[in-house]
Curated annotation (Swiss-Prot):
Residues 117-167, 175-185 have a biased composition (Acidic residues). Residues 90-185 are annotated as: Disordered. RNAP is composed of a core of 2 alpha, a beta and a beta' subunits. The core is associated with a delta subunit and one of several sigma factors. Keywords: DNA-directed RNA polymerase, Nucleotidyltransferase, Transcription, Transferase. Participates in both the initiation and recycling phases of transcription. In the presence of the delta subunit, RNAP displays an increased specificity of transcription, a decreased affinity for nucleic acids, and an increased efficiency of RNA synthesis because of enhanced recycling. This is Probable DNA-directed RNA polymerase subunit delta. Belongs to the RpoE family.
Amino acid sequence: MDLKVFDGQDKSELSMIEVAHAILAHHGKAMAFVDLTNEVQQYLGKSDEEIRERLAQFYTDLNVDGSFISLGDNTWGLRAWYPFESIDEATVGENEEDEEDDRPKKKRRKVNAFLADTDDDDDVIDYDNDDPEDEDLDTDDDADSEDDYDDDTDDFSDDDDDLDDGIEGQLSELHDEEDEDEDDE
């Protein structure tokens, strides 16, 4: 196949997307992805291994590039062939808008965030101290609580000084001979 669009250009510098666009324009009709890929491979002279390595990126590029359109059943065409009004593509959020048009619209109430809703007291924070559960029951008990405990500190003596040093007593200081020589001088 000879594509006049690429006359005088090095085939190794062409992208698969550019070649696919030229092939679709040359044929003038939609093609299956497999057939399109085979023709791109033949035109570029790439090996099966090279095409397999680049196949996922090529498919992604077809989807992302705005000049191609998927017609279903893995068939691809050029978007320029189809008038804008005739294209029936699913877009994000399109179904949601259709569903909203069919449903009757609810009236929305204005909500004042600063007014307490009397029906739903769970969300209201009560800052008043007039509730019996808010009373602090321990106000007078703090002074009496010290008398409830015995002073157990008398049971301990200062005999701890007579005990072995534990691991600290087993440690010895290390001195380098060089340090001792310097100390002697």
